[in-house]
Amino acid sequence: MHHTTKKKYGQNFLTDVNLLNKIVTKASITDKNVLEIGPGKGALTKIIVPQAKHVLAYEIDATLKPFLNFENHNNVNIIYDDFLKRDLLKDFDHYFSPNSQLSLIGNLPYYITSPILFKIIDTPQINDATIMIQKEVGMRLLAQPNNKNYNALSVIIQFLFSIEKIQEVKRHMFFPAPKVDSIVIKLTKNNNICPTFLQQFIKFVKASFKQKRKTLLNNLSCQFLLSKETIIPFFLQHHIPLQIRAEQVTLETFQKLTVKWFIFFNIS
C-alpha cells in the first residue's frame, strides 16, 4: 500500500522496531486502557493492541485507514478526527467503563505538542503519557531554574507530573526524516492536586513568565493589574529579591508563592 505523507499533519513515521518496542515496554500498558494519538500506519498500534485491555486511537488522516485494519481484534477502536477537537469525556463514556484510568501513548505532531499537553492536563482520566516529542520541547519540560529552556510549561508540567526521560531519537529514525531530533518521555500524573489551587497555580506561573525579559515583579504587576508599589511589600515580606526573574524561581517556591499571593491580594 502506498501513502503520501502530509506535511500539514506533521507526519513522520517511526521505523525503528526496537525503539517502538521500548516505548511500549516503558508505557507499561499490559491489560490497561490506552489512548493512542496519531497511529499513522499502525507500527506502534500493532504492538499495543495484543497487550492492552482496550485501545482508542485518534487519527486525523482518514487516508491511512487501509493501514489500520484491526478487524481480527475486538479491543481497538479508531476515530478518524482531530484529537484536539474531540469531546473526550463523551468518547470515554462510549468506549470505556465508568471511572476508567487511561494511559496515553503517541508520537505527537510537533506543531501541536503544547495544546495536546494542556488537553492531557485537563483530562483527569489520563493517568500517564508516554510520548515522542520534539527534543527542544522535551528539554523545556525537563529544564531546571537558571536554564535557558526553563519556562512556564516546564513549571506547570513538573508540578503536575513526574517526568522520566526515556531516550533521545535521531531524525534519521523516521520516514520522512524531520528537520529536528526527538525525545521520548513518560509523564505520570501527581494525584490529589486541588483543582482550585491548580487553576491559581497555572494563572500565577503563566503571569510570571509572560515576558521573558521582564522581572517577576514587572510581569505580576502587568498581568494582575496591580501597581509595583502595591506588590513590593509582598515581595519584601516573603524575602523575594525585587530584581528576580521567573526563570530563577524554583517549582517549590512557585507553589508557596501561589498560595500566599492569592491570600495576600484576596484574588479569586
Curated annotation (Swiss-Prot):
InterPro entries: KsgA/Erm, rRNA_Ade_diMease-like_C, rRNA_Ade_Mease_Trfase_CS, rRNA_Ade_methylase_Trfase_N, rRNA_adenine_dimethylase, SAM-dependent_MTases_sf. Its EC number is 2.1.1.182. The keyword rRNA processing applies. It is found in: Cytoplasm. It catalyses: adenosine(1518)/adenosine(1519) in 16S rRNA + 4 S-adenosyl-L-methionine = N(6)-dimethyladenosine(1518)/N(6)-dimethyladenosine(1519) in 16S rRNA + 4 S-adenosyl-L-homocysteine + 4 H(+). PROSITE patterns: RRNA_A_DIMETH (PS01131), SAM_RNA_A_N6_MT (PS51689). The keyword Transferase applies. GO terms for cellular component: cytosol. Keywords: Cytoplasm, Methyltransferase, RNA-binding, rRNA processing, S-adenosyl-L-methionine, Transferase. S-adenosyl-L-methionine binds at residues 12, 14, 38, 59, 82, 107. GO terms for molecular function: 16S rRNA (adenine(1518)-N(6)/adenine(1519)-N(6))-dimethyltransferase activity; RNA binding. Pfam families: RrnaAD. Signal peptide: none annotated. Belongs to the class I-like SAM-binding methyltransferase superfamily. rRNA adenine N(6)-methyltransferase family. RsmA subfamily. Specifically dimethylates two adjacent adenosines (A1518 and A1519) in the loop of a conserved hairpin near the 3'-end of 16S rRNA in the 30S particle. May play a critical role in biogenesis of 30S subunits. This is Ribosomal RNA small subunit methyltransferase A.
